[in-house]
């Protein structure tokens, strides 16, 4: 009896289809997001189209001093001013990450480091290489906390996330975010009133598309809608940690520990002579 692989091989030999055509026909479960993925397309922020900010939001933006983006004082060239504010000397920045504080959400998700998606009963887990952080995306029918429940839980670096499938798109909402963590590497702020919607759609065996919308009426006058973020599957043996391939065969530990920060991490990122590039 012919196996499927035999049929595919025979089809190629007889010229019935190209390898690329057959690859496009590979079956996949659109509701299975498991695997190791890495953002390969999309802005490092929500998007380049930043909504008009409230006075309170503008003040918070000005207080944040990033080391990434174009330098403060350079021509905007059509960019939002938030992307042209980087300090020229890393030690003059005040990025919380430089003190080994968590990236928080959505910043960690926007970082182009590998992340593993793991399906469990009633949850989707996201295990990040950077920080070795874990997000729990609840899918057991619960709603995101609100009112007194949210107040009692208090803010969290990665918030409180719940959602459900809408067709073959996984829709998640996150609330209760700690406002000390920046939205992105550029220092855009978020308030504790922020709600972020994520919409994950698996478009192929090796791709997931993510669309996000940030709602924060305290800092932004209208919702901030993302561009399309594309996640590409990474083979476990090809997962890289700062250029090291296959040494650990999967997600590895990328933790910034305060005791290390004082010695090496701090010298690289905060010492002007270190010539380091902050994450």
What residues fall within each predicted segment?
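Positively charged n-region of N-terminal signal peptides that target proteins for export
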Residues: 1-5
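PEST-like low-complexity, intrinsically disordered acidic/proline/serine-rich tracts
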Residues: 23-279
């Amino acid at each position: 009896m012919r196996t499927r692989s035999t049929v595919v091989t025979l089809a190629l030999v007889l010229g019935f289809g190209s390898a690329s055509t057959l690859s496009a026909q590979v079956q996949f479960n659109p509701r299975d997001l498991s695997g190791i993925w890495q953002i390969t397309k999309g802005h490092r922020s929500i998007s380049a189209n930043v909504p008009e900010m409230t006075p309170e939001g503008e003040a918070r933006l000005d207080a944040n001093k990033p080391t990434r983006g174009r330098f403060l004082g350079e021509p905007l060239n059509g960019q939002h001013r938030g992307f042209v504010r980087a300090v020229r000397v890393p030690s003059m920045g005040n990025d919380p990450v430089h003190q080994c504080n968590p990236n928080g959400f959505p910043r960690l998700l926007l970082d182009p480091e590998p992340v593993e998606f793991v399906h469990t009963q009633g949850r989707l887990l996201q295990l990040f290489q950077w920080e070795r952080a874990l997000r729990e995306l609840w899918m057991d029918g619960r709603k995101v906390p609100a009112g007194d429940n949210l107040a009692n839980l208090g803010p969290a670096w990665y918030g409180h996330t719940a959602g459900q499938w809408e067709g073959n798109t996984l829709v998640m909402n996150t609330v209760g975010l700690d406002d000390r963590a920046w939205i992105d590497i550029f220092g855009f702020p978020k308030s504790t009133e922020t709600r972020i919607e994520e919409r994950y759609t698996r478009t192929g065996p090796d791709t997931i598309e993510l669309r996000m919308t940030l709602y924060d009426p305290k800092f932004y006058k209208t919702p901030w809608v993302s561009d399309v973020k594309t996640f590409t599957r990474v083979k476990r043996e090809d997962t890289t940690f700062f250029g090291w391939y296959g040494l650990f065969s999967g997600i590895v530990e990328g933790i910034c520990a305060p005791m290390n920060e004082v010695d090496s991490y701090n010298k690289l990122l905060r010492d002007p002579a270190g010539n380091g590039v902050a994450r």
